[in-house]
């Protein structure tokens, strides 16, 4: 940005006004950054498009505001890590909501306690419903933010700047929902495994007890 100021030969007053304009533009750029960060990207009219795989702004006007736009990420593992952010966030949030006391507090009964089937079903049904609602809210809110961040800087080449709303919403919503329901499935499989192990141990003990009883005639 500073280099663009120097190349454009702006005076102090023009630099201040341009900086204010850049700051006012930051909320939109931050929303575009979410789309870029999760693999969708954004476009500046038909002059340039920016994703983690490619980013070329040489056709853009030499405005300092365009100096804050990102470059492509050349390291593959960094791209993979960034793409996994919504999934990992959803997974950790789902596990926390299901296990913590302030959430649904899903717990396994002690071995000597009887299994309350209705309570067990409710313990998984409520989180499933909550995760469905959360996934829908993420999709709706992200699509609204992406739509509001779009706009125009002109009537020809810069007539449309911003993100593709549907594609960006999908990049945010799908992995987040997948992370939430992966957490639900992990808890379900883990609890089923514990119950299965307990059942096997009980059967082994019963078999040993039956074989150790003396035979009477």
Regions found by a protein language model. Give the residues of each.
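Long, glycine/tryptophan/cysteine-rich extracytoplasmic
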Residues: 2-85, 147-217
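Alpha-helical transmembrane segments and their helix-start/interface "positive-inside/aromatic belt" motifs
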Residues: 15-28, 122-136
């Amino acid at each position: 940005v500073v280099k663009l100021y120097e190349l454009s030969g702006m005076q102090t007053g023009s630099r201040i006004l341009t900086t204010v304009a850049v700051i006012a533009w930051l909320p939109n750029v931050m929303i575009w950054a979410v789309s870029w960060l999760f693999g969708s990207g954004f476009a500046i009219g038909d002059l340039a498009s920016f994703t983690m795989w490619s980013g070329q702004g040489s056709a853009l006007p030499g405005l300092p505001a365009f100096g804050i736009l990102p470059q492509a990420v050349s390291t593959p593992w960094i791209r993979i890590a960034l793409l996994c952010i919504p999934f990992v966030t959803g997974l950790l949030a789902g596990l926390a909501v299901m296990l913590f006391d302030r959430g649904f507090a899903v717990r396994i009964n002690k071995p000597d306690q009887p299994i309350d089937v209705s309570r067990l079903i409710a313990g998984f049904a409520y989180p499933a419903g909550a995760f469905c609602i959360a996934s829908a809210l993420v999709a709706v809110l992200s699509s609204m933010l992406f739509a509001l961040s779009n706009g125009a800087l002109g009537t020809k080449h810069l007539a449309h700047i911003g993100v593709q709303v549907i594609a960006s919403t999908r990049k945010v919503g799908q992995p987040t929902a997948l992370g939430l329901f992966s957490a639900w499935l992990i808890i379900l499989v883990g609890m089923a495994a514990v119950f299965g192990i307990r059942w096997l141990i009980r059967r082994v003990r019963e078999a040993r007890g039956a074989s150790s009883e003396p035979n009477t005639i």
